[in-house]
Amino acid sequence: MCGFQITLVGTHIPGYMQDRGLGGWSATIILALIGLFNIIGTLGMGYLGTKYSKKILLSILYFLRAIIICIFIFLPPSFYTSIFFGITFGMLWLSTVPPTTAIVAQIFGTKYLSTLFGIVFLSHQFGAFAGAFLGGYFYDNFGSYDYAWYIAIGLSLFASLIHLPIDEKPLIRVETA
């Protein structure tokens, strides 16, 4: 979900903005703002994860991504919507990493955290491939990125719901003799 959205934006935002009549400058601004505000969002989410439920934070984060993408693609393209998207999507860009890592560590412990997070990151890369590929596929076959954006919105809504039933309590392990 996250990988799909990040790679869709990172790969296809220049073409999308060109299609919307705003040239390369808007994509440059968006990507620069995403990079800047990603730092703030990731640090902020790390802090919030020490104070609040990580699954709730992830649910809110993914729901906000859906809203931000909707605002961005359904409002008329402009300098202001580009700035809005760059700042807000940047705040949410990789802010999923601290609570996701913390949930994995909290539930499974830290002994195998590198292996478990490797599995999480592998699934992220499958999503990244899909975001890059499907963005191009839809554009080449339908002349628009709309379907890719709709998938990104749907994945955000799905992710916001699927995190809610997570039991954040550590798994009970039976010690072997």
Predicted regions and their residues:
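Extracytoplasmic gate region of multi-pass secondary transporters
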Residues: 1-45, 131
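Loop-to-transmembrane helix entry/capping segments in MFS-fold secondary transporters
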Residues: 24-25, 110-120
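Helix-to-loop junctions at the C-terminal end of transmembrane segments
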Residues: 42-53, 139-140
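Structural signature of the two symmetry-related core transmembrane helices
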Residues: 56-71
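Hydrophobic core of transmembrane alpha-helices in multi-pass small-molecule transporters
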Residues: 81-95
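Intracellular juxtamembrane helix-capping segments at the cytosolic ends
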Residues: 95-108
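A membrane-interface helix-boundary motif in multi-pass transporters
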Residues: 137-155
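Multi-pass alpha-helical transporter architecture, strongest
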Residues: 153-177
